[in-house]
UniProtKB/Swiss-Prot annotation:
Domain spans labelled GMPS ATP-PPase: 208-400
Pathway assigned to this chain's UniProt record: Purine metabolism; GMP biosynthesis; GMP from XMP (L-Gln route): step 1/1
CDD domains linked: GATase1_GMP_Synthase (cd01742), GMP_synthase_C (cd01997)
Name of the protein in question: GMP synthase [glutamine-hydrolyzing]
GO cellular component terms, A-Z: cytosol
Superkingdom of origin: Bacteria
Function: Catalyzes the synthesis of GMP from XMP.
Gene designation: guaA
Catalysed reaction, written as an equation: XMP + L-glutamine + ATP + H2O = GMP + L-glutamate + AMP + diphosphate + 2 H(+)
EC number: 6.3.5.2
Length: 525
């Protein structure tokens, strides 16, 4: 029997901060399981979850507004440690009898806080010492309102010149508030503070590791499916690949992977997926060669959202056809990860807006009557990659740049044709190959090539040619919510351009996209 890796757990209540998922990832990195819930949960739900500690996230609202979010009262009577971060500190202070006021001085960015009182939260933690010998911390602030009076049973632990209560604490009740963001890397000792809270104050044991996650997932898969057979749509992407490896470890040949080659993959990608998972790892793979079917369905369609929906629909039809041939199959596996679960919950409550539709086997017909197996649904993407490494998947595959679900269908602008896809595949392969050779691939967050359905005059030898244009795109980003275009060296771009024009017959011009996000999106469609 494996250890219960969920035994010690932290509950994070989300007040809307852009950093809230980062808080959860930091807690997981410490080795402790946590979940992220909306702030307005019931006492019954908290009791049922039985957390070892609670973190109140930051948020964009003002606690001085009458209808602003508040922590459930039970948070402060549950008898477990509580850490309030930014807005979380402000609502803690206000709900426990302190005062919060709006401020004309919005504090955003780097700040240095001076620790004036000892606290379990910052014990033996410092970045420097003040002239008076007091510990100093380099932190990241992002707030307008600030606490102007702390609750009666709290003490001031640290302050800045403009923020008198940068850290407050009630050591007896184990309540702590920080006006900065310990989860961001700009707060240099932030991870150590979170470790103090999670491991020392909440007394959690670090049981959440790649090896124990795999052991737990394998056991749970076996308990869920018993002796039944499972089917999985394998794309070769990170999530479906790790899902396949977990299921293979748990149930072996009772897993059938359906790999649909839609003709919209990268150069040699289909062959690589089949070789790795079929020949090397020994998985049972059904290969569906469906390029003609996808391209026929896409003929004459140039609107991006329509293309996405067609690609998703045809995939579902093909997968359904293959699943119906597998009479023993009782379960459908999906590579759903924790951010998908969070996003779905937000959509269900009307708190999210779909900018681009996602195509997934979640749209499979109800008449298939298959149970659902989602072994990654508790995991963030970085955790999925870590367990992928532990399972023996190659680093280059797990840390490859993101590739859209519809593939080249949204990187060929306008109508998708086989000729365009073939040209784009070869041009993109050259770009990626040169990025690796120049040691630039891992220095950018995402890089790819886009096919533009416009012709441009070129000169080749003594003759002229009238051929297609491609655009190179490379961006740097932390969270893919915002992005800067990558300032790649001119000589590198020149080398890539020359190779594409000389080696890919049919392309006469290469341009480089220098648009940031916003206003542009990272993908062109």
């Amino acid at each position: 029997m494996t250890k219960n890796i969920h035994k010690h757990r932290i509950l994070i209540l989300d007040f809307g901060s852009q950093y809230t998922q980062l808080v959860a990832r930091r807690v997981r990195e410490i080795g402790v399981y946590c979940e992220l819930w909306a702030w307005d949960v019931s006492e019954e739900q908290i009791r049922e979850f039985n957390p070892s500690g609670i973190i109140l996230s930051g948020g964009p609202e003002s606690t001085t507004e009458a209808n602003s979010p508040r922590a459930p009262e039970y948070v402060f009577t549950a008898g477990v440690p509580v850490l309030g971060v930014c807005y979380g500190m402000q609502t803690m202070a206000m709900q426990l009898g302190g005062q919060v006021e709006g401020s004309n001085e919005r504090e955003f960015g780097y700040a240095q806080v001076e620790i004036t009182t000892e606290s379990a939260l910052v014990r033996d933690i410092e970045d420097a010492l003040s002239p008076a010998g007091k510990p100093l911390l380099d932190v990241w602030m992002s707030h307008g309102d600030k606490v102007t009076a702390i609750p009666a049973d709290f003490v001031t632990v640290a302050s800045t010149d403009t923020c008198p209560f940068a850290i407050m604490a009630n050591e007896e009740k184990r309540f702590y508030g920080v006006q900065f963001h310990p989860e961001v890397t700009h707060t240099r000792q932030g991870q150590r503070m979170l470790e103090r809270f999670v491991l020392d104050i909440c007394q959690c044991e670090a049981l959440w590791t790649p090896a124990t996650i795999i052991e737990d997932a394998v056991e749970r898969i076996r308990q869920q499916v018993g002796e039944d057979h499972v089917i999985l749509g394998l794309s070769g992407g990170v999530d479906s690949s790790v899902t396949a490896m977990l299921l293979h470890r748990a149930i072996g040949k009772r897993l059938t992977c359906v790999f649909v080659d839609n003709g919209l993959l990268r150069l040699n990608e289909a062959e690589q997926v089949l070789e790795m998972f079929g020949d090397h790892f020994g998985l049972n793979i059904v290969h569906v060669a469906a390029e003609d079917r996808f391209l026929s369905a896409l003929a004459g369609v140039d609107e991006p959202e329509a293309k996405r929906k067609i690609i998703g629909r045809v995939f579902v039809e093909l997968f359904d056809e293959e699943a119906c041939k597998q009479s023993e199959v009782k379960w459908l596996a999906q590579g759903t990860i924790y951010p998908d679960v969070i996003e779905s919950a937000a959509s269900a409550t009307g708190k999210a807006h779909v900018i681009k539709s996602h195509h997934n086997v979640g749209g499979l017909p109800k008449e298939m009557k298959l149970g659902l197996v989602e072994p990654l649904k508790e995991l963030f993407k970085d955790e999925v990659r870590k367990i992928g490494l532990e399972l023996g998947l190659p680093y280059d595959m797990l840390f490859r740049h993101p590739f859209p679900g519809p593939g080249l269908g949204v990187r060929v602008l306008g109508e998708v044709k086989k000729e365009y896809c073939d040209l784009l595949r070869r041009a993109d392969a050259i770009f990626i190959e040169e990025l690796h050779k120049a040691d630039l691939y891992n220095k950018v967050s995402q890089a790819f090539t886009v096919f533009l359905p416009v012709r441009s005059v070129g000169v080749m030898g003594d003759g002229r040619k009238y051929d297609w244009v491609v655009s190179l795109r490379a961006v740097e980003t932390i969270d893919f919510m915002t992005a800067h275009w990558a300032h790649l060296p001119y000589d590198f771009l020149g080398r890539v351009s020359n190779r594409i024009i000389n080696e890919v017959n049919g392309i006469s011009r290469v341009v480089y996209d220098i648009s940031g996000k916003p206003p542009a999106t990272i993908e062109w469609e």
